[in-house]
Amino acid sequence: MLLAVGAIIAGLILLVWSADKFVDGAAAAAEHWGMPTLLIGMVIIGFGTSAPELAVSAIAAMEGNSGLALGNAYGSNITNIALIVGLTAIIAPITVHSQIIRKELPLLVGLTLIAGYQLIDGELSRTDGWVLLTVFAAVMGWFIFQGLRNKDDSIEAGIEESTLAHPMPLRNAVFWLIAGLVLLVASSRMLVWGAVYVAQSLGISDLVIGLTVVAVGTSLPELASALAAVRKNEHDLILGNILGSGIFNTLAVVGLAATINPLQVDPEVLYRDWSLMLALTVGLLLMGFGFAGRSRIISRLDGGILLLVYVAYTGFLLTTMIPATG
């Protein structure tokens, strides 16, 4: 138990440090390569930091643990929006000024609806998995096309200004881009191992582990990257990170797990967990678009509401599921 606790502490410390280096490398590399920074946020930061989710769900599927595989993916999406966006907005309100992000938000809502439709029959077959992976490949191509078309997006000017203030040679940028990502994944795996060991010692079910402990652990790279980005005032990089990760989890993580081994879907996954994931995604859409006379900003009040939802959901999971395992 002491070794597991030590892994959690060491993983957290290494995670925060490596995330800061990774964001620096990503922004500098984007400037050198002439790539839109939001594209870096979507593809490298958003998808790259989702590698822990991919690994955990793939291994869980190989072992026939559908609850852990799905709980990790959907729990990470819930954590990303409710906990990470909520906490980040409380620290500093997030301004939504990128035209690209206002396209990605409705896309994520649509993909979440597709995911829910696949859950209705109580199973995610290999065919369902291949459908998700095919859609993922198409979305990736669309991301790249849109990113290259929008080189003048306002986010790029802001990131160029910040990177020019602290120029980094391309060699150093690439080094920290790769090393930072490797350390992010390694430290998150260290943390998840410790957290899962502790949770299992307490007798918590696999589904709850996936939705809470594992989801939070594998989402910590997104949290660390978001906190580093808000410190640098790179607001669209924050949302690019979260949206990219959400799309990756919904399509690639679940899709790969289902192609490895068909996943059995418990009823509560659809009616409780997926429903909350959809509600949070729609809520983020409304905040990002600024409907009903609102400014396009995720305020501290919005962040507080998201964080409260996360605390209530996690508390509900623990109070309803832990007794059932005893």
Question: What residue spans do the PLM features occupy?
Answer:
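Hydrophobic alpha-helical segments, chiefly the membrane-spanning helices
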Residues: 1-326
